[in-house]
Amino acid sequence: MSPKPWKIVSSHKDRSYRVFSLRTDRAISPRTGKEHSFFILESTSWVNIIPLTSDGKVVMVRQYRHGTGEVTLEIPGGLVEEGDTPETAAMRELVEETGYTARKVISLGDVQPNPAIQNNRCYSFLAQDVRLTREQSQDEKEDIEVVLKPLSEIPEAIRNGEITHALVLAAFYRFYMEYQPGVSIHGENQK
């Protein structure tokens, strides 16, 4: 028997925080008929963007992430704010975090960050021929260093653990599947 959606019998928001809310659902399993509790992190969707310069460099950001207590190498990204489209949010995050702008972005698709406990999506984009047009405009909780990394070095940076953020890896995976089919992140080129 194929799995089916569970019937939600109750749902209530437990707490709200700046970037997410915690919700508790009670739902009935269609297979067993038993009721179970589920805890959901409700969040607005996220975006990230792979910005490429005309000379083949990826505009990346190095920043501190309090959850892991580490400084990570990532691509620009952030929240889709109310009234924004994912595309608009990606372009905004690019300019705010790096000072680079893009005239147009191309969708690389979206993923569900963790559908077991989260209700949001992460939309990834590609921007080509980005240009530095202004200074960064970081908020007071950000401390971002802009890093220009040659696109040719990205697979090795993934292999050696320099790039570890799962949503950044998903964006690069989509990019390499669509735009660089001869490049492998496993160490050998495909022919």
Model-derived features: positions:
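Acidic, metal-coordinating catalytic segment for phosphate/diphosphate chemistry
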Residues: 11-48, 54
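A short, amphipathic edge element
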Residues: 1-12
